[in-house]
């Protein structure tokens, strides 16, 4: 009998949601995703110390300004960790733009190009990189511009249907709708504390987005993210991609049995509606209290961890 991780791989591209190289070697995912929190965690791993030292040495050569050195070193560290991961996976690494730029399209584009340049200078072509941006209106506009210039993007912190629709309409390469954080909100804000996988609000959200994309012929890849349990993952089997943390990859690899396809679409392609404009986007997004709160909360948390990373680098400079 096969294990559930192996069975899941037949239906869905499995991505590792970690910056931990040991986990990459163990689970051999197709792609990997990182974010400021994961980079901060990875930076605590002793084997990564040389990557930090190298990033700091490089940053010192780029500028005499201490403030600029901190920014440069944190960019270079994220790329250095990405380069190590790319040695272990056949596909793509997702590297995130500073969350503090989430409401600034112009600076998000500039930061994305900076990260791409660092990868290119290390010999990595654009087709192995995804630039992660928060799914704000400004982040989506930045992604739209980057996609036109041949830089594929992964739109993250996606909680509302309006965000998903706007991403598809912008021609974004991939979205990361968050499953577990949606569940967290409903547990905290409703009387119901337990949800079966098929009634999990995060699972329902991703299922609706997946079906809408397929029904309207959008090429944007749907990659479910932020899982709280393996039941959520199995309920989304068949989704284009799923990015899974090492603890849940381990759980799936140790569970025996075939995984049943839950998502798929073989129907006719429907006409697409007119794209949302900015006013419509904000109106629809803000009708969803969960999405409004979780997007702001997610940006704050990533910004805090980016600040912690920069403080760590500052102490070493």
UniProtKB/Swiss-Prot annotation:
PROSITE patterns: TRANSALDOLASE_1, TRANSALDOLASE_2
Known EC number: 2.2.1.2
Subcellular location: Cytoplasm
Coiled-coil positions: none
Record keywords: Cytoplasm, Pentose shunt, Schiff base, Transferase
Major localization class: cytoplasm
InterPro entries per UniProt: Aldolase_TIM, TAL/FSA, Transaldolase_1, Transaldolase_AS
Reactions catalysed according to its record: D-sedoheptulose 7-phosphate + D-glyceraldehyde 3-phosphate = D-erythrose 4-phosphate + beta-D-fructose 6-phosphate
Chain's role: Transaldolase is important for the balance of metabolites in the pentose-phosphate pathway.
Designated name of the protein: Transaldolase
């Amino acid at each position: 009998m096969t294990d559930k991780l192996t069975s899941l791989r037949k239906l869905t591209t499995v991505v590792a949601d970690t910056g931990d190289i040991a986990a990459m070697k163990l689970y051999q995912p197709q792609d990997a995703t990182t974010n400021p929190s994961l980079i901060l965690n990875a930076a605590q791993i002793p084997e990564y110390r040389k990557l930090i030292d190298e990033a700091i040495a490089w940053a010192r050569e780029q500028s005499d300004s201490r403030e600029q050195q901190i920014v440069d070193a944190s960019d270079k560290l994220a790329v250095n960790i990405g380069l190590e991961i790319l040695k272990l996976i056949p596909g793509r690494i997702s590297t995130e733009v500073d969350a503090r730029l989430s409401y600034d399209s112009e600076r998000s584009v500039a930061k994305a190009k900076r990260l791409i340049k660092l990868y290119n200078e290390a010999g990595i072509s654009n087709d192995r990189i995804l630039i992660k941006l928060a799914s704000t209106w400004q982040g989506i506009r930045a992604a739209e511009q980057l996609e036109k210039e041949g830089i594929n993007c992964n739109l993250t912190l996606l909680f509302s249907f309006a965000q998903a629709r706007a991403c598809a309409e912008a021609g974004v390469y991939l979205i990361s709708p968050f499953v577990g954080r949606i569940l967290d909100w409903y547990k905290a804000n409703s009387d119901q504390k337990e949800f079966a996988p098929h009634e999990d609000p995060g699972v329902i959200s991703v299922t609706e987005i997946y079906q809408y994309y397929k029904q309207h012929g959008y090429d944007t890849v749907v990659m479910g993210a932020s899982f709280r349990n393996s039941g959520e993952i199995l309920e989304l089997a068949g989704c284009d991609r799923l990015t899974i943390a090492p603890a849940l990859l381990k759980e799936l690899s140790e569970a025996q049995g075939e995984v049943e396809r839950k998502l798929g679409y073989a129907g006719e392609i429907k006409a697409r509606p007119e794209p949302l404009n900015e006013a419509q986007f904000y109106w629809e997004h803000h009708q969803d209290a969960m999405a409004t709160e979780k997007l702001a909360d997610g940006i704050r948390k990533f910004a805090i961890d980016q600040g912690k990373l920069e403080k760590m680098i500052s102490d070493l400079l």
